[in-house]
């Protein structure tokens, strides 16, 4: 079976979202036979074969190319990542349904109206986008076979065509933390880490407040907060850390997967979303916590975790108060090291995109 994965993105292959959709497309290809991923290069279509890795650029506009593939080739499966709807998109969906193509439409964060408006610096643009979504939604739902969602709120409405999945990762290349290297001597430094693009709803200002409250130590143990990535939120964190006089905050900048592999052995816990209420959510859907788990690092979050095994997650209060750093430290020190050594295996089995997509498509 031939599949197309369609994502209205014009991004570098090094960016996190592109890596995610590429991993999803590769997993679909393994599940159904073959898959091409269609993204944008400017206004035109950019096509990558998941089997060969070959990249080509079409002279056709993004959705025009997709429409031609539907009408003129033997595409049998179409997976579309949510984009700002248009009449051209509806034309694509209608053509796919007419040809009997199985059509899965993904909303990567559901519901997303509140998040779009809250995290946007230009509220009027976000409101305009949401209004367009509302206008086109009945037509989108009419033509799709399944609605694939990663749910961020337990209160979200459920539709009959809806299938829930979790975020996943391409597990190949992710090296697990080596717990055989753990020092048997009493710990001298406890290290927390936050990786990736950060937004205000990650709530790491609460960690800074907590570190100030405990003077960056628990008893005789120094506490460090490591931040990997770049964003305007990280710039705000740097300024806040300086204003608070914090000395144990380490900003690493952007790192490759290989560089992260070398760093992870020193991290004790990974921080997910600590202020989910800022995006009207109560489920942590971030990719960062999936990667923490798959690397064998336990997670701190203010919401529900997708990991089925609850031993490796600490849920803190979802508010604006300082996070209790001692609570995090106590959680970590009470974890069994032998169990932690199994965390990566458990997580990679649950969060492998190959496993997620095979289950989604084949049931």
Language-model region placement:
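Nucleotide-sugar-dependent
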Residues: 14-15, 19, 202, 258-263, ...
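Membrane-proximal helix-turn-helix segments that form the acceptor-binding/catalytic region
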Residues: 87, 94-98, 105-115, 124-147
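Conserved donor-binding/catalytic core segment of Leloir-type glycosyltransferases
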Residues: 4-6, 183-202, 208-211, 225-226
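A charged, aromatic-enriched C-terminal amphipathic alpha-helix characteristic of glycosyltransferases
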Residues: 16, 320-323, 333-363
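Nucleotide-activated donor-binding/catalytic signature segment of Leloir-type glycosyltransferases, i.e.
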Residues: 235-262, 269
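Glycosyltransferase donor-sugar binding loop
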Residues: 195, 223-237, 253
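Donor nucleotide-sugar binding/catalytic pocket of nucleotide-sugar-dependent glycosyltransferases
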Residues: 129-180
